[in-house]
A protein has these predicted regions:
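Conserved active-site tyrosine of GNAT-family acetyltransferases
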Residues: 14, 109, 114
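Conserved beta-strand in the GNAT
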Residues: 41, 47-55, 62-67
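A conserved beta-turn-beta hairpin within the catalytic core of GNAT-like acetyltransferases
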Residues: 56-66, 73, 123-129
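Conserved catalytic-core motifs of GNAT/GCN5-like acyltransferases
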Residues: 98-100, 115-131
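Conserved GNAT acetyl-CoA-binding A-motif
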Residues: 82, 89-102
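A short beta-loop-alpha structural element at the N-terminal edge
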Residues: 1-12
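Active-site rim helix/loop that mediates acceptor-substrate recognition in acyltransferases
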Residues: 14-45
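Conserved acetyl-CoA-binding loop-helix of GNAT-fold acetyltransferases
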Residues: 68, 74-87
Length: 137
């Protein structure tokens, strides 16, 4: 089941997946509590196993902090989260969604119809990223 969650509910998955090699890294992201930001959680047996955050800016949205616990990867949870967000944004007549995708996640997003825009860049200390976008009709 996918539902809206509070920012603090994303922290455990962020820590385990997105910040696992950075024990002192804060799990709160800039903008987590902004009124134009929302968070989704994917629940299995009342446990959050997948998360993502969306920041709205006009009719453009940024997806960030997308993560699925390792033991639940490969079960289409990430795809379902992204598709849910796309449906929500499409119904609100958004024109574009974008993200800074880790280099290793590019094939996942390409399968969902996202395209690379621009050159590879580094977000320290995370690693190599690409801006990826998808336009809504």
């Amino acid at each position: 089941m996918i539902k809206l969650i509070a920012p603090v509910e994303t922290y455990s998955v962020r820590r385990k997946v997105l910040r696992k090699n950075m024990p002192d890294e804060p799990h709160q992201f800039h903008g987590d509590f902004d009124p134009e930001t929302f968070h989704l959680g994917y629940f299995l047996n009342n446990e959050i196993v997948g998360i993502l955050t969306v920041i709205k800016n006009g009719k453009i949205a940024q997806l960030r902090g997308m993560a699925v616990l390792e033991e639940h990867q490969g079960k289409n949870i990430g795809r379902k989260l992204v598709e849910k967000v796309e449906k929500m944004l499409s119904e609100e007549h958004f024109t574009k969604i974008w993200m800074n995708a880790r280099e290793t996640a590019v094939p996942f997003y390409e399968k969902l119809g996202y395209s690379i825009e621009g050159e590879i860049f580094v977000i320290k200390p995370i690693g190599f990223h690409y801006v990826m976008t998808k336009y809504f009709d």
